Amino acid sequence: MSERKLFTSESVSEGHPDKIADQISDAILDAILAKDPEAHVAAETCVYTGSVHVFGEISTTAYVDINRVVRDTIAEIGYTEAEYGFSAESVGVHPSLVEQSPDIAQGVNEALEAREGQSDDFNVIGAGDQGLMFGFAIDETPELMPLPISLSHQLVRRLATLRKSGEISYLRPDAKSQVTVEYDEHDKPVRVDTVVISTQHDPEVSNDQIRQDMIEQVIKAVIPAHYLDEKTRFLINPTGRFVIGGPQGDSGLTGRKIIVDTYGGYARHGGGAFSGKDATKVDRSASYAARYIAKNLVAAGLASKAEVQLAYAIGVAQPVSVRVDTFGTSTVSESILEAAVRQVFDLRPAGIIKMLDLKRPIYKQTAAYGHMGRTDIDLPWEHLDKVSPLTEAVAALSEGA
């Protein structure tokens, strides 16, 4: 009998409390970068019933109306009714932002390499902190993402579309999805075993109506029919009621959905969150670079699955380590792939920032529905422009091996 395994990932909607916080943090970052691309930003947000607290460290020459940015973001998400317990125009906004520590700034503004006399423009910026970051790609989906997280994101995005268009009028902003995929003995996805959708709703709608709409207008509209069968389970609002939601039901905090933001648990995670951080913070920029590398490796046919680890020391430009793991799927040795990666990609913070053009206000759009594998927006770390350079570098290194 062939061995089959299950793997589960989840996603949450833009109206989930933690995602509200992420979007506010990134909206503040974007507003600052639009006026001052050289700004250093670390903006954290906490939301709960009737209140938003914004705190952190910012070094900038720009003035931004934090209060207005917060309220506009909340309204765009859909919290505009007082009965939700959290409304854009009535919520209390409490900013508490200070300047970045000069001890940190001296290492970011002038890397160790520059202080030691290594004259190179890309040695100017040091990593904003120590840490390890992962990027991943796999050939399970056209966007080279694991299927469980891809489907989970699509479900909550579909919910948001139906809510904002008014097609399903009883929907409220908070929602979660979870998809369990069954894999065969070759680790290939064969079917969807279980789908969970929990969606906030108006009080008068029946559970039967919600279930019918979720199955017909959300699940079957998103998940390809060949993955669904008579044994697939649909668990819709399993508690039986989800009227109280958003920050009225749970507090939210920036950086608490790091697995949703990346690969749904299918790949490793270095632990650093993304939202509210400018690109000198390698938690964010190096994670994007690692995804860029992994995706181009898989797209080039050099592996069917690739995980890239990068690691940095605070105030140092060059990564302290670069590792490529292809889980036995590569067409050449991993040492050759690592050497090719070092040739093709400049992985110093300034190199990553230039390569991916990260001083632009592009971050708020990433703060819900995943930072990786997005097909609805154009993100530079999802581009496949390094396929040819990687292929050529691997060929040259293989000849010399």
From Swiss-Prot:
Gene3D superfamilies: 3.30.300.10. Homotetramer; dimer of dimers. This is S-adenosylmethionine synthase. Belongs to the AdoMet synthase family. Keywords: ATP-binding, Cytoplasm, Magnesium, Metal-binding, Nucleotide-binding, One-carbon metabolism, Potassium, Transferase. Its main location: cytoplasm. GO terms for molecular function: ATP binding; magnesium ion binding; methionine adenosyltransferase activity. It is found in: Cytoplasm. Catalyzes the formation of S-adenosylmethionine (AdoMet) from methionine and ATP. The overall synthetic reaction is composed of two sequential steps, AdoMet formation and the subsequent tripolyphosphate hydrolysis which occurs prior to release of AdoMet from the enzyme. ATP binds at H16, D174, A175, K176, R241, F242, D250, R256, K257, A273, K277. Residues 100-110 are annotated as: Flexible loop. HAMAP family: S_AdoMet_synth1. GO terms for cellular component: cytoplasm. K(+) binds at E44. The gene is metK. Its EC number is 2.5.1.6.
